[in-house]
A protein has these predicted regions:
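Conserved N-terminal catalytic core of the sugar/cofactor nucleotidyltransferase
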Residues: 1-9, 32-100
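Hydrophobic packing residues within well-ordered alpha-helices of enzyme cores
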Residues: 18, 59-63, 206
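Conserved core of the sugar-phosphate nucleotidyltransferase
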Residues: 108-181, 188-190
Length: 219
């Protein structure tokens, strides 16, 4: 049986490291805004909540032009809070199970739906590629994720993809999600093919990554 739940897209941030004066949701990859690609990816998901903050009106207009039934949540404190605050706001409008998707993350469609259909609380891991990775340390090198840190390197990076009960995603604080998750470890994990956009080099890599998939994440 296919899993159920709500995808919460955290799209409230200012994307300052890209230097484009745009929220990452509106930054174009292969000619389309990132959030448009994400909504293509989520075409088979019924419940989607988009959390907005910086340039909220522009993001809302774009989201609703593509997916009129999407729910919108607001993080009015986007300038002084982290992704965990946005995830908490979005979780208030979600069902019992939440899949958290950062607004700067593009995920291979097949891998995303494999992740979606995991019934347990789970993290999405990949090999480290970003400039400021959150490293995932595994029990005995291959078991559950037992530690998340930006200080000690490992062969795995948490890409920000998370599936968990709503009571977990709504209570991770107002800073970094990985900091809030520490009290909920250990967690299961699967690997995902994805690209995260933090800086201009990541943006160029995202374009190449998406071009390899025909320029689209739609089904």
């Amino acid at each position: 049986m296919q899993a159920s739940g709500t995808v919460v897209i955290a799209a409230a941030g200012m994307g300052t490291r890209l230097g484009l004066n745009l929220p990452k949701a509106l930054v174009e990859v292969e000619g389309r805004p990132m959030i448009a690609h994400q909504l293509d990816l989520l075409s088979d998901i019924e419940d989607v909540v988009v959390v907005v903050g910086y340039r909220a009106r522009q993001v809302i207009d774009l989201v609703l032009s593509i997916r009129p039934q999407a729910l919108i949540a607001f993080n009015h404190d986007y300038a002084s809070t982290g992704t965990a605050a946005s995830l908490s706001k979005g979780s208030q409008a979600a069902g019992d199970r939440v899949v958290a998707l950062d607004g700067d993350l593009l995920v291979d469609r097949g891998d995303f739906y494999t992740f979606w259909n995991c019934n347990e609380a789970v993290l999405g891991l990949t090999r480290p590629t970003t400039g400021r990775p959150v490293y995932a340390h595994l029990h005995d090198g291959g078991g559950h994720v037992v530690r998340l840190t930006q200080d000690d390197t490992s062969e795995w990076e948490w890409c920000g993809l998370l599936a968990a009960p709503r009571q977990v995603t709504a209570s991770l604080g107002s800073g970094h999600v990985f900091s809030g998750l520490r009290s909920h470890l250990p967690l299961d994990w699967i690997t995902v093919d994805c690209v995260e956009v933090d800086d201009p080099d990541d943006l160029a890599r995202a374009g190449s990554w998406l071009a390899e998939r025909g320029g689209s994440l739609s089904g």
